Amino acid sequence: MENDVLSVEIAEHGAELTKLYNKKTGTDLLWDAEPKFWKRHSPVLFPNVGKTYKNTVKINGTQYPTSQHGFARDSEFKCIHAGKETSTFLLTSTEEMKEVYPFDFELFITYTLEKNVLHVKWEVKNPSDETIYFTIGAHPAFRFAKNEEGKTDYILKFPGKDELKYCLINLKEMAPDPEELHEMKLNEETYPLTEELFENDALIFDNTQIEEAWICHKDGTPYVGVKSEGFPSYGIWSVKDAPFVCLEPWMGRCDNIGFDKEISEKPGINKVESGETFEKEYQIVVTI
């Protein structure tokens, strides 16, 4: 898809955004999936964001195995509409999926270009007679503008904020403790990017603290941002020495340490009643 400002490519595998090109500046903004650092571009996280505790989930009293970030990112979607500025992809539940996630669902993902903005809309339809539960999230990785640049050439900006609080993954338990919070004190809404920032994996922000985040050049010039109104959780992540940063709005997130209750009792879980549809959208904004 393309317009006068942006050119994008989306794969049917995972309905994953694989290219985001700024035609005005000649810049590829999306990570190229070089496996040395990370083999993905912008996976869709469904039906679970992150890991469930001990890699299992309890649904109606039965334990099911789970994989990190769910199966949608490795599933084949069907492109049901391909236009010049908007495309829609569909993933429908199968019997194989029900072995790990025993719900009927239809997941629609629509990408729409509007000038310098890429809108990404999720719809989860429930065609069954029972309530379904899930979390869903975005994971776009934004590469730095020049090959020789690193994290210290950029800063993060959070408009309207002067302080944020986040929790980290306990690397022994592979789950976060939401009671163990860290403060991020901002300087004029900004915070420096460093390699050390991601030593404990992702930074996890809860309580709808972040609804807009930007990667900016060190002089404060905006580079690329993500707007995500009403998303309760947010992840910021990178890999050591990798020339990219992920800005990740999440509708729900990984399990906390020790969570072993029914999926319906999980904090931040989304539910869709029989015949109803869940809808949510975020936007990637490119500076031109």
Regions found by a protein language model. Name each.
Residues S93-N147:
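Acidic, contiguous internal or C-terminal segments within carbohydrate-active enzymes
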Residues E2, T62-K115:
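Extended, loop-rich substrate-binding clefts of extracytoplasmic carbohydrate-active enzymes
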Residues M1-K58, Q63-T66, T208-G230, F278-I288:
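Beta-strand-rich N-terminal accessory domains
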Residues A141-F144, E148-S228:
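Active-site/ligand-binding surface loops and adjacent short beta/alpha elements
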